[in-house]
Amino acid sequence: MSASTAAPARDRLRIAIQKNGRLAEPARSLLAACGLSWRQSRDKLFCYGESLPVDLLLVRDDDIPGLIADGVCDLGIVGQNELDEQASARRRAGLPAAYHAVRGVGFGQCRLMLAVPEEWGWQGVAQLAGKRIATSYPAILADWLERQGIDASVVELSGSVEIAPRLGTADLICDLVSSGATLAANQLKPVELVMESEAVLAGAVREPADARAALLAMLLRRMDGVLKLRDSKLLMFRAEQGNVDALRRLLPDADPLVQLPDDGNGALRLQTMCHGAVTWQRLEELERAGAQGLMVLTVERSLA
């Protein structure tokens, strides 16, 4: 289907995610936390939504932007780097991207970086002039080189980019880096950041106007609730009125304290949502400041 052809009307939402790879399991877990469940087809590429009319398509990550642009899928979970690469390539071909990042989903963080052989004495981007750079992200790299005013050759490779300098097919590389272990194993060192990336929920620029619109709104609301609470804990405790201000100062990353009905013991019953780590040391600080009966509870979902 071409980007200019209207997608047929349908009443089920369709989401594309990576079949295998580092984003596959976190993406499925996030969607499951939003209340979705599926029945998998025999070919294991299509998952029929059982709890809601929301189906999954399991594909290669580099297929996801095109599936959204062509109206085959409504949403996809994919790396921002892949989204930007294909958007840039489409612009260079005179085509609209037709999709955008709706929101980050809190996993898959990495960096697209230039890496050079360890023996290089790196002095800055001017050193790239006339060099050959191997990458799986030629459009992003070409855009970056243009912004830097550097004339260098882009060598496109679909995989094993890190061995290109050793094979003599490139002088340096531009590749995704998370821990840096792969670079070190190939006697390379990162020297220049091209872009920061993370997994995002991507969607079509033109949102569906049929029955899928309500499903989309509901799913996004649920996802917001899950993402907001992912690293949050509900903290409950009792305290005397005179200690409340000191306790509040120890909770800078928490929501405003909420007072619960009195339990007849004289102390205030309080609760708050903490959006940072609630460690033993932190609980002990709160106890020394006058908090009593401290409880830390996990919250799985919320509708704000």
UniProtKB/Swiss-Prot annotation:
Against PROSITE patterns, the record matches this protein to: ATP_P_PHORIBOSYLTR
Keyword S-adenosyl-L-methionine listed? The answer is: no
* UniProt GO MF annotations: ATP binding; ATP phosphoribosyltransferase activity; magnesium ion binding
User: Which example biological process does GO assign this protein?
Assistant: L-histidine biosynthetic process
Q: Where found in the cell?
A: Cytoplasm
**Which family is this sequence assigned to?**
Belongs to the ATP phosphoribosyltransferase family. Long subfamily.
In its UniProt entry, what is this protein called? ATP phosphoribosyltransferase
Upper classification of the source organism reads: Bacteria, Pseudomonadati, Pseudomonadota, Gammaproteobacteria, Lysobacterales
